[in-house]
């Protein structure tokens, strides 16, 4: 059965689809896929900030220190902390008169 053979006609109750064989497995599969696509699209629009923020920033956690000796872990932590610490020497004090 071709989908082009379906006819939509206006009735008293609204638009209805008069299909000769609506139990066709292809039609059922297409309906299920369409409904799932709609649900996923709605969820994506509702939670896109959360999802994409997690993908963008959640995966950038740095290298794993699992399996490394404790001394190397401590050295790595100190390097990371020193990269974050602010050095007061680089600031310029401006005094307004």
Swiss-Prot record:
Residues carrying Phosphoserine: 64, 82
Domain of life: Viruses
Membrane topology category: Single-pass type III membrane protein
Keyword Transmembrane helix: yes
Means of activity regulation: The M2 protein from most influenza A strains is inhibited by amantadine and rimantadine, resulting in viral uncoating incapacity. Emergence of amantadine-resistant variants is usually rapid.
InterPro entries: Flu_M2
Residues covalently joined to lipid (S-palmitoyl cysteine): 50
Keyword Phosphoprotein: yes
Stretch list, region Disordered: 60-83
Residues with site note (Seems to be involved in pH gating): 41
Keywords noted in UniProt: Disulfide bond, Host cell membrane, Host membrane, Host-virus interaction, Hydrogen ion transport, Inhibition of host autophagy by virus, Ion channel, Ion transport, Lipoprotein, Membrane, Palmitate, Phosphoprotein, Signal-anchor, Transmembrane, Transmembrane helix, Transport, Viral ion channel, Virion
A GO cellular component entry from the record: host cell plasma membrane
Family: Belongs to the influenza viruses matrix protein M2 family.
Biological function: Forms a proton-selective ion channel that is necessary for the efficient release of the viral genome during virus entry. After attaching to the cell surface, the virion enters the cell by endocytosis. Acidification of the endosome triggers M2 ion channel activity.
Designated name of the protein: Matrix protein 2
Protein's organism: Influenza A virus (strain A/Chicken/Pennsylvania/1/1983 H5N2)
Source species taxonomy: Viruses, Riboviria, Orthornavirae, Negarnaviricota, Polyploviricotina
């Amino acid at each position: 059965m071709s989908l082009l053979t379906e006819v939509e006609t206006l009735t008293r109750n609204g638009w209805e689809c008069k299909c000769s064989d609506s139990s066709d497995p292809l039609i059922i599969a297409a309906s299920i896929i369409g409904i799932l696509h709609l649900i996923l699209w709605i969820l994506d629009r509702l939670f896109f900030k959360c999802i994409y923020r997690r993908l963008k920033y959640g995966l950038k956690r740095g290298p794993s220190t699992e399996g490394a000796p404790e001394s190397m872990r401590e050295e790595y932590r100190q390097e990371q902390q020193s990269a974050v610490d602010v050095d007061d020497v680089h600031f310029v004090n401006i005094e307004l008169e």
